[in-house]
Amino acid sequence: DSIRLSLLTCAPGEEIYSLFGHTAIRYENPSQGIDIVFNYGLFSFNTPNFIFRFSLGETDYQLGVTDYEHFAAEYAFYGRSVWQQTLNLTDEEKTELIQLLQENYRPENRVYRYNFFYDNCATRPRDKIEESIAGKVVYPTEPQDGSRTFRDIVHQYCKGHPWARFGIDLCIGSEADQPITQRQMMFAPFYLMDAFDGAQISTDTYSRPLVKTNELIIDVTPEPDESGWMPTPLQCSLLLFILTAAATIYGIRRRTGLWGIDLVLFGMAGIVGCVLAFLALFSQHPAVSSNFLLLVFHPGQLLFLPYIVYCVRKGKKCWYLTLNLVVLTLFIVLFPAIPQRFDFAVVPLALVLLIRSASNLIVTSKKK
């Protein structure tokens, strides 16, 4: 049988949406001149209200089909290697998988609601392959259930991209720190590839490997990053803390409130808080609903900003800043015990808001 079906795993790219790699299914039928790729990762930034729908977690992806030649040329052009795992399927299973993919490619079926952790370009091919098999796919025991969290895997693939890691860490909450099963780890294409490598197709009478061969079919060396040095989130937050601390000491010595600094700092914190609150309350994205960073960045920082500025300008004690000081102090003290992993750059940012809140108490008490 000359028909061959394979799982393709593509190396990560430089864009944030490609940092985790990509998965597709290749279908080869030389007798009919067919060599195509089924790709569940198609989306368009030009979709109406794309940014708003994305923030709501209502991004629609779709299954696309392209010639393998064009698929390979694109990944080679962008310096992304591709691995091919030829599937060890019977003729009946091959026919079933082809029919499932063709049915899924019908216009009324090809669009699906994307979910970063649970329904993406890696989980869809896995599910279709499993559905086509007359038996059960038994995956290897490593990595064990509970040995990873979603955040662990995010950090693994954001290595070398500190701002992407920082941004994702801001948005995902404590749910991302819960241990996950091996199957859940397969949202990441290379975890899926490793699982397929050791998987067996088990029936009542025999078992066979899921994968016949695994080969590197596009071998390219990525271009070196020539973007130059860029400060990390931690370096930026530490610099902001030092500058804010120096300005605050100056203001306390002069017994004056620096309302312009408070306007910028609490305004920025409030804007970030509005984004986090929106994600927590309205978004369908996974793992964003229980975010303890809302103790630091929340809409109240923006809502009470006019009152904060008024009190600081008039040299009056601000009850909101007093409450803010208490909450931020508790956050810093209890930081190690909070059931959520934070990027450490958050600590200097929290301290910035804390010392600005404390400065109001100190300055107003000195004026009495």
Question: PLM features: residue spans?
Answer:
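Catalytic-site beta-strand/loop segments enriched in glycine and acidic/polar residues
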Residues: 2-8, 101-107
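Glycine-rich catalytic cores of cysteine/serine-nucleophile enzymes that process amide/ester linkages
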Residues: 3-79
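Second-shell loop/turn segments in exported
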Residues: 13-14, 80-88, 107-116
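Extracellular structured ligand-interaction cores
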Residues: 22, 35, 84-86, 122, ...
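Activation targets extended, charge/polar-rich intrinsically disordered C-terminal tails
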Residues: 103-306, 310-317, 326-368
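Interfacial loop-to-transmembrane junctions
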Residues: 321-323
